[in-house]
């Protein structure tokens, strides 16, 4: 199928810099959450890698929405499993070597409106994959995509947050279904690694974005990008105090393979681009300055919108970088590519 130019550039960049071709040659890789941003771009990268290097990689993908999958991949050579991750998962057809578990709800309002489903998706889906990994000798590695939200509330700008730090999460707040769900499943992964020697690693991802993000996405970065494209004021529904780093899609995907192939089982690794740490408010002003000075920043705080508590999480990536990973895209380049992508699909 014909791919968007910006996405194709990202895919070709990934393939040109991918250092692990021999390690995954002729292997079968299961990817869950295949129609999400990370899952879909990751699969496209693997398919392109096959074309360029003739690696014989087999991709098995889990997704719920057939039409969305067809829109993303057309008739590409992917072996599909059509189901929700809370349903019993039958992998008996394949000898899976690697699992990259991307499936997760990502919308804040979903966590608030469907906390039970949020928890079940995290726990039941991951437990099935860990069970498979514990019982099949073909398994070489698994990465679980966790989140910086598993850290909870931390408000300290003075130090980089390392993987051994833990902040407070209120267990009787429905929005905690996501953050506590991620924390719980990290514990589950560590337990399987410890007791059953499952080679699973946890990736604590910061906010990841890039070409391929839906124009319907309601996350802050997407709303801000669309505002500067349309020449509209950037309207914030919080004070914008929360701060975190960011990571471009292909940089994050590259990190997942470093963890899959070089990470220590049972351990968690922060995934973020150094020197991108910024508050939401400062990000708004940065985008206005860099991309459309005719826009203004307007603050209209509202309650009960499902937003996370104020946190200031500057993640340390030394542990990941020690494996050899390094990012290629800085914050301005990330938004430049996202904005150009949005313009290309208008």
In which residue ranges do the predicted regions lie?
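Non-catalytic terminal and boundary segments that flank Rossmann-like NAD(P)-dependent oxidoreductase
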Residues: 1-29, 89
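C-terminal substrate-binding subdomain of Rossmann-fold SDR/epimerase-dehydratase oxidoreductases
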Residues: 2, 6, 228-346
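N-terminal Rossmann NAD(P)H-binding glycine-rich loop of SDR-like oxidoreductase domains
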Residues: 28-48
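SDR active-site strand-loop-helix element
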Residues: 32, 62, 99-105, 142-148, ...
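NAD(P)H-binding glycine-rich loop region in Rossmannoid oxidoreductase-like domains
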Residues: 82-121
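Conserved Rossmann-fold NAD(P)-dependent oxidoreductase catalytic core, especially the SDR/UDP-sugar
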Residues: 127-175
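NAD(P)-dependent short-chain dehydrogenase/reductase
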Residues: 154-164, 187-244, 249-260, 285-290
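Active-site helix of classical SDR
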Residues: 177, 181
């Amino acid at each position: 199928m014909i791919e968007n130019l910006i996405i194709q550039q990202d895919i070709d960049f990934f393939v040109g810099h991918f250092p692990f071709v021999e390690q995954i040659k002729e292997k079968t890789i299961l990817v869950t959450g295949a129609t999400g941003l990370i899952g879909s771009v990751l699969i496209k990268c693997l398919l392109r890698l096959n074309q360029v290097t003739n690696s014989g990689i087999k991709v098995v993908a889990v997704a719920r929405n057939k039409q969305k999958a067809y829109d993303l991949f057309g008739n590409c050579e992917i072996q599909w499993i059509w189901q929700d991750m809370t349903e019993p998962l039958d992998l008996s057809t394949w000898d899976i070597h690697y699992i990259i578990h991307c499936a997760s709800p990502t919308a804040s309002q979903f966590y608030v409106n469907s906390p039970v489903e949020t928890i079940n998706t995290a726990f039941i889906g991951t437990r099935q994959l860990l069970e498979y990994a514990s019982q099949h000798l073909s398994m070489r590695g698994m990465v679980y995509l966790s989140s910086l939200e598993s850290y909870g509330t931390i408000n300290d700008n003075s130090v980089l947050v390392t993987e051994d730090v833990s902040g407070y999460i209120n267990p009787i707040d429905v929005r905690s279904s996501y953050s506590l769900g991620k924390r719980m499943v990290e514990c589950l992964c560590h337990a399987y690694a410890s007791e059953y020697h499952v080679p699973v690693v946890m990736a604590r991802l910061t906010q990841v974005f890039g070409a391929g993000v839906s124009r319907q996405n309601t996350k802050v970065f997407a709303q801000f990008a669309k505002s500067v494209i349309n020449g509209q004021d950037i309207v914030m529904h919080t004070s914008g105090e929360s701060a975190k780093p960011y990571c471009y899609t292909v940089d994050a995907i590259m990190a997942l393979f470093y963890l899959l192939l070089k990470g220590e089982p049972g351990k968690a690794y922060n995934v973020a681009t150094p020197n991108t740490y910024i508050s939401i408010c400062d990000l708004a002003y940065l985008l206005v300055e860099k991309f459309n000075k005719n826009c203004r920043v307007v603050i209209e705080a509202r309650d009960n919108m499902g937003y996370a508590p104020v946190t200031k999480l500057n993640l340390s990536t030394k542990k990941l970088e020690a494996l050899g990973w390094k990012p290629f895209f800085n914050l301005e380049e990330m938004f430049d590519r996202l904005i150009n992508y949005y313009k290309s699909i208008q």
